[in-house]
Swiss-Prot record:
Its main location: membrane. Keywords: Membrane, Metal-binding, Transferase, Transmembrane, Transmembrane helix, Ubl conjugation pathway, Zinc, Zinc-finger. The gene is ATL46. The chain crosses the membrane at residues 45-65. Pfam families: zf-RING_2 (PF13639). It is an enzyme of class 2 (transferase). It is a single-pass membrane protein. GO terms for molecular function: transferase activity; zinc ion binding. The RING-type zinc finger domain mediates binding to an E2 ubiquitin-conjugating enzyme. Belongs to the RING-type zinc finger family. ATL subfamily. InterPro entries: Znf_RING (IPR001841), Znf_RING/FYVE/PHD (IPR013083). Pathway: Protein modification; protein ubiquitination. This is RING-H2 finger protein ATL46. It comes from the Eukaryota.
Length: 376
């Protein structure tokens, strides 16, 4: 329509407006292509993805391999335990001991444990009330480790630093995983102690013990100094006492009768926490150590050696209480076999055939030597 109007106005010779401009499709530049939707992945990104995939694959294989290797020894151990039940039982006992005494403490060396003095319970001299008299059987005492009452033929090991004594096997088991006293947590050696040559210093030793009162508060007990007399070492023993009226602050001891358990040695005493306390007796108990029983001195009598190496009695006295006490077999691992206990006791007791110069110098042994020289 515009072209017709332009033609008419051109014939009349009157141009009202210039003719429209038309672009030549041949001379016009080509239009840019529309952007494509699918861009190509960069080779660098593709390389990184491949590397990560390979790393994840290798780590997965290593994880599966480690899990297989961990499970395989356990299966082998179970099959071995089925073939050898005795070995599996001993391994189970060792695991129980490690779990019970799983502490940062690595325990003591066996040579140090063997150097501690050993005596029979019937050899204790003194009375629990602080007066005179021979024999500690006037008042029964209990072992703080196994909770059993001491009998006359029981062998006890003394910790000279704190004067506490326990059953031979009980304290040996404890010291294999701990280096402190199980009762007062006191150290068994002074600063500068050498495991290879055990040396105890009794000159300036003081013991601080804290006792828990009936209402739960703690009070510091009287500090006592350990004095090494002529061939005599002090012994501090205690027993479990039951407090009936804990809330009123009045403690009443329950009379406990002792009975011998020969049929079932695995029976143990267990107490309700909070109703029983292990109370040390205010006693003047002492143990005389003859020259032939000290590892540092030469033996003079062979009869004492036979007495020291004699097997201890296996029957344990178990106290029975009217109420609040029950028997348990949860600590049967503490009880050794008869043959094992006798062999360990004979192995750990000092023998008279030992060479004097090869044994460690202990302070109570040096005290004997000084006293003998002064007497001469």
């Amino acid at each position: 329509m515009s072209w017709v109007r332009f033609t008419i106005e051109q014939k009349d010779g009157n141009f009202a407006y210039p003719p429209p401009f038309y672009k030549d499709p041949i001379l016009s530049p080509p239009s840019p292509p529309p952007p494509s939707s699918g861009n190509r992945i960069s080779p660098a990104v593709l390389f990184v993805i491949v590397i990560l995939a390979v790393l994840f694959f290798i780590s997965g294989l290593l994880h599966l391999l480690v899990r297989f290797l961990i499970k395989h020894p356990s299966a082998t151990a179970s099959s071995r335990s089925n073939r050898f039940p005795e070995i599996s039982t001993s391994d189970a006992l060792q695991r129980q001991l490690q779990q019970l005494f799983h502490l940062n403490d690595s325990g003591l060396d066996q040579a140090f444990i063997d150097a501690l003095p050993v005596f029979h319970y019937k050899e204790i001299v003194g009375s629990a009330g602080g007066g005179g008299g021979n024999g500690a059987a006037q008042e029964p005492f209990d072992c703080a480790v196994c909770l059993c009452e001491f009998s006359e033929k029981d062998k006890l090991r003394l910790l000279p630093m704190c004067s506490h004594a326990f059953h031979l096997n009980c304290i040996d088991t404890w010291l294999q995983s701990n280096s402190t006293c199980p009762l007062c947590r006191g150290t068994l050696f002074s600063p500068g102690f050498s495991m290879e040559n055990p040396m105890f210093d009794f000159d300036d030793i003081r013991e601080d013990e804290e006792g828990v009162t009936e209402n739960g508060s703690q009070k510091t007990m009287e500090i006592q100094e350990i004095v090494v007399e002529k061939g005599v070492l002090p012994v501090r023993l205690g027993k479990f006492k039951r407090l009936d009226n804990v809330g009123n602050g009045q403690g009443q001891d329950v009379v406990a009768g002792g009975e011998t358990s020969s049929s079932n040695l695995d029976a143990r005493r267990c107490f309700s926490m909070g109703s029983y306390q292990y109370i040390l007796g205010n006693s003047e108990l002492k143990v005389p150590f003859a020259n032939d029983r000290l590892p540092r001195l030469k033996p003079q009598d062979k009869e004492s050696e036979q007495t020291g190496n004699s097997s201890s009695e296996d029957n344990k006295k178990i106290n029975t209480v009217a109420k609040g006490e029950s028997f348990s077999v949860s600590k049967i691992w503490l009880w050794p076999k008869k043959d094992k206990f006798s062999s360990d006791a004979q192995r750990r007791l000092p023998s008279s055939s030992l060479n004097v110069d090869d044994l460690p110098k202990l302070p109570w042994m040096e005290e004997h030597k000084k006293l003998e020289n002064d007497g001469r």
